[in-house]
Amino acid sequence: MKKICLLLTIVAGSIICTPASAQVRVNINIGSQPVWGPVGYDHVDYYYLPDIETYYYVPTRQFVYFNNGRWIYSSSLPYRYRNYDLNRGYKVVVNQPRAYQNYSLHRTEYSRYRNYGGRQMIIRNSNDPRYYVVKGHPKYYNRGRD
């Protein structure tokens, strides 16, 4: 009888007790950042470009700009900014959902960075090996990701 009780206890204990599982989520998107993005960030949701009052959404690689009363997502800049140099313009990292909803705040807060003219280190010009995974970097290597 002792053996049966012991066996039932072990079986019941193994059914009731489940192994602990810890989930740690670290979101690093260095490889998906554009080469014209500034160095120093492991994760970026949006860049705000004060010179042209436009956002760039890193996960979908799209520019977000206001046109005719609505926000437009586009893979390229609007025609009026076709000559804008993304390498030289200042980029502000904004890590918040739908950053463009705070456009008025960003426009005021970051207006001092208009015409900043290339005084920000960008990924393409970095010698930090962690940026070599960014497609378009002069020392790019993909570690079998392509």
Task: Say what each PLM segment does.
Residues 1-23, 146:
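Classical secretory targeting signals
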Residues 24-146:
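Low-complexity segments
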